[in-house]
Curated annotation (Swiss-Prot):
Zn(2+) 1 binds at residues 40, 65-66. The active site is at 42 (charge relay system), 45 (charge relay system). Belongs to the zinc-containing alcohol dehydrogenase family. It comes from Psychromonas ingrahamii (strain DSM 17664 / CCUG 51855 / 37). InterPro entries: ADH-like_C, ADH-like_N, ADH_Zn_CS, GroES-like_sf, L-Threonine_3-DHase, NAD(P)-bd_dom_sf, PKS_ER, Zn_alcohol_dh. NAD(+) binds at residues 177, 197, 202, 264-266, 288-289. Binds 2 Zn(2+) ions per subunit. Keywords: Cytoplasm, Metal-binding, NAD, Oxidoreductase, Zinc. This is L-threonine 3-dehydrogenase.
Length: 344
């Protein structure tokens, strides 16, 4: 049986609609009928066929890793799931036998394989993944929200890496993950949550999500905002989401002594920073990759169930046959999360 899929078919700019064989689940796998998928920044890198993509993505391959769907089949060894379960899933498939996996730190597996990056992805009518990677979506959480659990998980992992209760938090980079991280920090009890960017559309989205201040650093100095808020010692927690050297250096400059930074944005490999600030301020910098399995996933569901409203971050939905419009919208920078509906 042939099914529809979006794939990287050629080593050039673009994503293409194609048909592929319907996948068959192995002994420990789930077969998921995809309802909705979301376009990730990684998918845009793949679309643009940048240097990272050229060195990483096998061609041809079905891409995509943000999704929600319904279990329609499973392998004979699977336990804990039933046909009809609504699921999303962890996009990092881990080996299970390295030291970190065996110690319960699976998000630090050195042999991680990415769904839609190193193996067949979720931009298709059906997806097969290991049952271990699937997460049941609680009733009351919409398909739209469930489809963005992967990037929401990056935001939660970053925002909750350090204690933010009563603290002042700076987020550099108002992409969807940065905006969601800001909302999580505010929901979790931070005092001031300030986010910076140069994209006014996304700064407006951040304002809708309840940040204290959304600062266009092309028009306003972060130091002026700090003074207006009456802050005297800098930010306690920093979440670097942009990968922009100028943003990270600004963060270092405006951190309090003893401040803690979660680093999710991927900077150029030759980025230069003032290490004197790190040393003499006693700053802590923690690299963030993916989501903690599966602590972050349970926190995601609980945050939404406790009233965290992520609806404003989803700005556009397209039927999958209009996927090109969705990718164009994401590439324009004039969107939050863009969803492709496979049920239409």
């Amino acid at each position: 049986m042939k099914i529809k899929a979006l794939a990287k078919l050629k080593p050039e700019v673009g994503i293409w609609m194609t048909t592929v064989d319907k996948p068959e689940p192995g002994h420990n796998d789930l077969l998921i009928k995809i309802h909705k998928t979301a376009i990730c920044g990684t998918d845009i890198h793949i679309y643009n066929w940048d240097e990272w993509s050229q060195n990483t993505i096998p061609v041809p391959m079905v891409v995509g890793h943000e999704y929600v769907g319904e279990v329609v089949g499973m392998g004979q060894e699977v336990r804990g799931f039933s046909v009809g379960d609504r699921v999303s899933g962890e996009g990092h498939i881990t080996c299970g036998h390295c030291r970190n996996c065996r110690a319960g730190r699976t998000h630090l597996c050195r042999n991680t394989i990415g769904v839609g990056v190193n193996r067949t992805g979720a931009f298709a009518e059906y997806l097969v993944i290991p049952a271990f990677n699937a997460f049941k979506i609680p009733a009351g959480i919409s398909d739209d929200l469930a489809s963005i659990f992967d990037p929401f998980g990056n935001a939660v992992h970053s925002a909750l890496s350090f204690d933010v209760v009563g603290e002042d938090v700076l987020i550099t980079g108002a992409g969807p993950i940065g905006i969601m991280a800001a909302a999580v920090a505010k929901h979790a009890g931070a005092r001031y949550v300030v986010i910076t960017d140069i994209n006014e559309y996304r700064l407006d989205l951040a304002r809708k999500m309840g940040v204290t201040r959304a600062v266009n650093v092309a028009q306003q100095k972060l130091e002026d905002v700090i003074a207006q808020l009456g802050m005297t010692e800098g930010f306690d927690v920093g979440l670097e989401m942009s990968g922009a050297p100028v943003a990270f250096n600004s963060m270092l400059k405006n951190m309090s002594h003893g401040g803690k930074i979660a680093l999710l944005g991927i900077p150029p490999s030759d980025m230069s920073i003032d290490w004197n600030m790190v040393i003499f301020k006693g700053l802590v910098i923690k690299g963030i990759y993916g989501r903690e399995m599966f602590e972050t996933w349970y926190k995601m569901a609980s945050l939404i169930q406790s009233g965290l409203d992520l609806d404003p971050i989803i700005t556009h939905t397209f039927p999958v046959d209009k996927f090109q419009e969705g990718f164009d919208m994401m590439r324009s920078g004039k969107s939050g999360k863009v969803i492709l509906d496979w049920s239409i």
